[in-house]
Amino acid sequence: MGRRLSVWLCTVAALLSGAQAKGTPLLARPAQPSASRYSLYTTGWRPRLRPGPHKSLCAYVVHRNVTCVLQEGAESYIKAEYRNCGWGPNCPSTVRYRTVFRPRYKIGYKTVTDLAWRCCPGLTGESCPEHLTDHGATPPHQEPEPQIPLGQLGPGPRPSPYSREAPRPRGRKGQGPFGERLEQRLSQAYGTLSGLVASHENPNRITGDSRAPVVPIGFGVIPEGLVAPEDRGRGPLIPPLSEILSKVTEVSNTLQTKVQLLDEVRGLALGHEAHLQRLREAPPSPLTSLALLEEYVDQRLQRLWGSLLDGFEQKLQGVQSECDLRVQEVRQQCEEGQAASQRLHQSLDGRELALRRELSQLGTQLQGLTLTGGGTCCSQLALISARVDSLERNLQAVTETQGGPGTLAADELARLSAAMLQGGVDGLLEGLETINGTENGARGCCLRMEVGGWGVGGFGSTLEQRVQSLEERLATLTGELSPESAIPDRSARPLVHSELAVLEQRLVSLETSCTPSTTTAILDNLVAEVKAWQSRSEALLHQVARHTALLQQLNGTVAEVQGQLAEGTGSSLQGEITLLKVNLNSVSKSLTGLSDSVSQYSDAFSAANTSLDERERRVEAEVHTIQEQISSQGSRLQAGHRQVLNLRGELEQLKAGMANVARGLSRCRDTAQELQHTVGHFDQRVAQVEGACERLGLLATHLNSLPTEQLRSREGLWGHIDKLNHTLAQHTQDIARLRDDLLDCRAQLAEVRPGRAD
């Protein structure tokens, strides 16, 4: 009997140390009713299974998976905030875009530890129903576990972890995958420890009623009424020692796992503390500095002003280059017009010279035609006499036909001829006198004679011109007087003789006017020559009549030639004049085009000036606008400065909150260290329990030799059991305190994370 009792005590100590395994039954057999008033096989407050047919059931610790919502990470999105301007009633509202982080969730799985009633190992048949042989089955007629009275839980009672839900921070649906994993592990560890200790919080669980199984304990206790009669005679079933050792090994492994979890918690706490330290030591944001904001605004204004000036200078340079190009084009056109006018003047000068040459050639031709009658003065005199005869005849005819008008015409002819001859001969004779006065000697006399001959020739040409003019006037007069006038006869010849007499007198006076140095021989020769000239003149007078007809023919030919020349000259002149008119028209048109282009350029310049004025006004308006914006920016900067000050106050508050969080984390770290010390102390207590088991084993060997009556009087064993219960109560209090610290840590972490997201 003593040996069996020692084995059961070791089993109870191992089970109280927190042994659990998936699907592993925790066996216990009831003791005899006469053993002691301190029965270890008592039921809970309300049994989960009614006593009766379920005597072969055992409590199993099972694990099941449940779905839950986990936070996978965070994603960012842009949120627009509209804020009213605070420095004025009419200022526009500002829009600020913020990047906000929101959590992203996923469906995860969580393992939950629970108790299930199943058939004990090795039991089958009528006492083990089929629906309880399945490992996933749960016993029927399960009822919820009632709340244990606070008076029976010892000094530090705590409710079951499954009936209390951890508080969650506001505004947050999850704590991230890392926090979820930590929470899951801590919850599992805390649930396991609480499940193991919950049944030992009240000593009445051990010494209470023995009619129902103890449900909250991590193992099943079958009451006395459920033991079969055949098993009661054979005594309680004793589990093998290897199973007990395996349970102890599992307990030690579980404790090592809890130590590792505590180490992880400590590492997480230290990591959070380091992160908070980095947040405290992080430099402030550059946007909170007013000097940096002012420098940024100044740089933006300088860049804007530089860009405006550069654009204005580029526009001015473009306008100036365009104006220069247009001025160069106008200058080029003016130079081309000047060159064209110069070419026109040169062509006109060339035409004028050509016309002058042609006129001089025409004069020489006319002079040649007048001299075709003879090469000497005699021939010229013959022609003159012939023309004079014809004139006399014409005048005679006029006098005969008209009578009175004839005398007038004769008087007119005499007057004209006398005046013409007088003027022309006087001039020529004066020229001859001057020439003769410059010569000396015989050579001089000869030269004077030659010059006199030249003078006579010139006199003949002059006389011919005078006669031609006289003929023209006579023809005009004859046409006016009578269109049917006849040719005059020789009645007008005395006039010619008188003129010749006058000429002879002038020659005589010329002879007498010679210098005294001349010799008489020369004078005699000259007199003889004059006489010869007189005789020749008489012969010429006779020849005049013969050459009258020839002279008339010659006059007709000359008239025809003159008409042809006049027509040719007129046509050429008309063509040249037409060409000149065309050139002048083209020049006038080009000048008109130049004036139009100049007017266009002037209009363009005026438009450019107006556009520049408008541009200047616009630039001034923009500058005023920029100044107003700068002033408004200054007011906004003041408002921003106030906001910065407010933000600084909020940051100070946040720093104070972070300091509080740091203090909380330090408390959490201290709690973790205390928990570690508690776990170490718990290991020591487990070692003490193992030693106690050994001592109890030795005690059991000694008790086997003692009778049963003496064993009843030994109260020391139950004293040890009371100590064990007291130790379990202390452990429950420590675990409750650790749970409170864990909840505080969770709340502080939940407060820190929203601040980081903001």
Swiss-Prot record:
Disulfide bonds join 58-120, 85-91, 119-128. InterPro entries: Collagen/C1q_domain, EMI_domain. Residues 54-130 form the EMI domain. Pfam families: EMI (PF07546). Glycans are attached at residues 65, 436, 555, 609, 725. Its main location: secreted. Residues 1-21 form the signal peptide. Keywords: Coiled coil, Cytoplasm, Disulfide bond, Extracellular matrix, Glycoprotein, Secreted, Signal. PROSITE patterns: EMI (PS51041). This is EMILIN-3. It comes from the Eukaryota. GO terms for molecular function: identical protein binding. It is found in: Secreted, Extracellular space, Extracellular matrix; Cytoplasm. GO terms for cellular component: cytoplasm; extracellular region. SUPFAM superfamilies: Tropomyosin (SSF57997). Residues 379-401, 460-483, 528-567, 642-677, 720-753 form a coiled coil. Residues 131-178 are annotated as: Disordered.
